Amino acid sequence: MPTINQLVRKGRKSHKGKSKSPALGYVYNTFKKEEIKTPSPQKRGVATRVGTMTPKKPNSALRKYARVRLSNLIEVTAYIPGIGHNLQEHSVVLIRGGRVKDLPGVRYHIIRGTLDTAGVEGRMQSRSKYGAKKPKNKK
């Protein structure tokens, strides 16, 4: 514990918070070959690997994921939400931040219904989260 005199001389340092999705915080300048700190809400990337992984201890499933090389040359692991997907290697995807609690190392989600990613078929509720179109009304 510091003395009053030490606090008067130095004071307390405030800690800066750490980003939960650091890959979204950089833009790569190809001309200067340097990274610029510019946060963005989403990033485009190319899927380099698509597969399944098993979750942490109390849960059991085969969760779909994709390894994505982003436009800023950082490679991340992103979760593919929803039932069924059409992604394969070299698919162009859009990712957003947001971790998957039971998959270690997965800090990003792929946005369904944009670029090469199709929306979830037959989805009626929470359609906007899964890129599903509004169904046609039959009369």
Curated annotation (Swiss-Prot):
Record's Gene3D superfamilies? Nucleic acid-binding proteins
Could you tell me which residues belong to the region Disordered?
1-22, 37-57
Q: Where is the composition biased (Basic residues)?
A: 9-19
What is the top-level taxon of the source organism?
Bacteria
Q: Name one GO cellular component term.
A: small ribosomal subunit
Q: Which GO terms describe its molecular function?
A: rRNA binding; structural constituent of ribosome; tRNA binding
Q: Which SUPFAM superfamilies match?
A: Nucleic acid-binding proteins
Keywords noted in UniProt = Methylation, Ribonucleoprotein, Ribosomal protein, RNA-binding, rRNA-binding, tRNA-binding
Tell me one GO biological process term: translation
Q: Which family does it belong to?
A: Belongs to the universal ribosomal protein uS12 family.
Which function does this protein serve? Answer: With S4 and S5 plays an important role in translational accuracy. Interacts with and stabilizes bases of the 16S rRNA that are involved in tRNA selection in the A site and with the mRNA backbone. Located at the interface of the 30S and 50S subunits, it traverses the body of the 30S subunit contacting proteins on the other side and probably holding the rRNA structure together. The combined cluster of proteins S8, S12 and S17 appears to hold together the shoulder and platform of the 30S subunit.
Quaternary structure annotation from Swiss-Prot or TrEMBL: Part of the 30S ribosomal subunit. Contacts proteins S8 and S17. May interact with IF1 in the 30S initiation complex.
Family annotation (PANTHER family)? 30S RIBOSOMAL PROTEIN S12 FAMILY MEMBER
* Name under which the protein is recorded: Small ribosomal subunit protein uS12
